[in-house]
């Protein structure tokens, strides 16, 4: 007879219960349908549906934990921890809208659940900034952008590191995994905590606009009825444009009928995309319809629809996660993974690549791994025990 060792998780499995909600979160995070997972672990889809509603029978826990861990790449302890709340798909506004599939949106939602687990751990170890986001429901988007610039003492200067600015106001800025990259970005309120989720698949300039767009949602739509027939995406876009490219700055820097080179200089100054700058200049009545179409065609032919030629802007880093993984913060990706039961690779995405510096091996070469300093930094301190 062949003898094998038994892990502590397996020894205690008979007294454990698999959380239905965590089972669902892990499945959605891996982009699997119920039929997909059921087939991989050898049960019927109806059985899996029952398990996601009521949990598997305790007699199955011992063997099922191993199957789920190997199939979904989550540690066994993840499935037996406390239940979690899964945000409603219908009440979550996605930046990509109809461009993203439901499976991709659900992968984003499940990442949101893991982000909440991570934030709970952060709050238990660090003095995390409290939310300081005013409720501007009903205010015109451009007016709201100017108001926020005023109360946050930003003046007419280019917005600095927007990730660190949001974090300094208590917003948890979280990265999305590749499985949800088509979502672009989304934001939610969970237990009075604002979250912004970002996918970094295009340009740093686009990522800054995505964050400003989601900040607009948090400011303008936190108290409004999600079923109210209003164009929230358009309002968030208008907020983001005025927040990043103030009309007063356009008038101060550009004459009537500016050249395309003038607009590109403003684009680099404000750290925004060429297309966003062109549209803002047009909306500020600086260009005729004919000029706008002409410049749009030129930018498209130069590749500005999908990239930012000539830009050396780097993806903005999180001050929160950089501190957590610093020598002062004293944490590693493995230590947090062990404490939260979130896989290390998932932490890498959630922390906007900051966890990569805590992984063994060479430093990542992705642009988002490079630092982007900012004066707007959250007051993060270690909680003394």
Whereabouts are the PLM-identified features?
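Active-site hotspot residues in diverse enzymes, especially metal/ion-binding acidic/histidine motifs
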Residues: 1-385
């Amino acid at each position: 007879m062949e003898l094998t060792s038994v892990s502590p998780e397996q020894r205690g499995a008979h007294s454990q219960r698999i959380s239905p909600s965590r089972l669902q979160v892990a499945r959605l995070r891996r982009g699997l349908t119920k039929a997909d997972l059921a087939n991989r672990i050898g049960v019927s889809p109806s059985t899996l549906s029952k398990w996601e509603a009521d949990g598997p029978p305790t007699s199955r826990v011992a063997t099922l934990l191993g199957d789920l861990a190997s199939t979904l790449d989550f540690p066994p302890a993840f499935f037996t921890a406390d239940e979690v709340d899964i945000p409603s798909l219908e009440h979550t506004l996605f930046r990509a809208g109809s461009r993203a599939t439901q499976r991709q949106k659900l992968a984003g939602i499940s990442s949101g659940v893991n982000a909440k687990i991570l934030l709970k751990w952060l709050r238990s170890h660090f003095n995390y900034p409290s939310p300081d986001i005013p409720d501007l429901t009903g205010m015109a988007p451009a007016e709201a952008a100017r108001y926020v610039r005023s109360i946050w003492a930003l003046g007419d200067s280019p917005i600095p590191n927007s990730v660190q600015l949001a974090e300094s106001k208590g917003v948890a800025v979280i990265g999305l995994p590749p499985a949800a990259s088509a979502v672009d970005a989304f934001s939610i309120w969970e237990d009075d905590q604002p979250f912004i989720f970002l996918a970094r698949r295009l340009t740093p300039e686009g990522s800054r606009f995505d964050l400003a767009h989601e900040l607009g949602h948090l400011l303008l739509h936190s108290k409004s009825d999600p079923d109210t027939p209003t164009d929230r995406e358009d309002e968030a876009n208008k907020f983001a444009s005025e927040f990043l490219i103030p009309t007063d700055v356009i008038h101060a820097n550009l004459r009537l009928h500016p050249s395309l080179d003038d607009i590109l200089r403003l684009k680099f100054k404000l750290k925004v995309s060429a297309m966003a700058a062109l549209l803002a200049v047009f909306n500020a009545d600086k260009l005729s319809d004919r000029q706008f179409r002409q410049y749009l065609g030129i930018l498209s032919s130069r590749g500005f629809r999908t990239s930012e030629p000539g830009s050396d802007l780097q993806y903005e880093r999180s001050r929160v996660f950089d501190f957590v993984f610093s020598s002062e913060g004293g944490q590693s990706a493995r230590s947090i993974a062990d404490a939260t039961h979130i896989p290390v690779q998932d932490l890498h995405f959630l922390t906007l690549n900051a966890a990569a510096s805590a992984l063994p091996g060479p430093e990542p070469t992705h642009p988002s791994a490079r630092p982007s300093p900012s004066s707007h930094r959250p007051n993060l301190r270690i909680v003394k025990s």
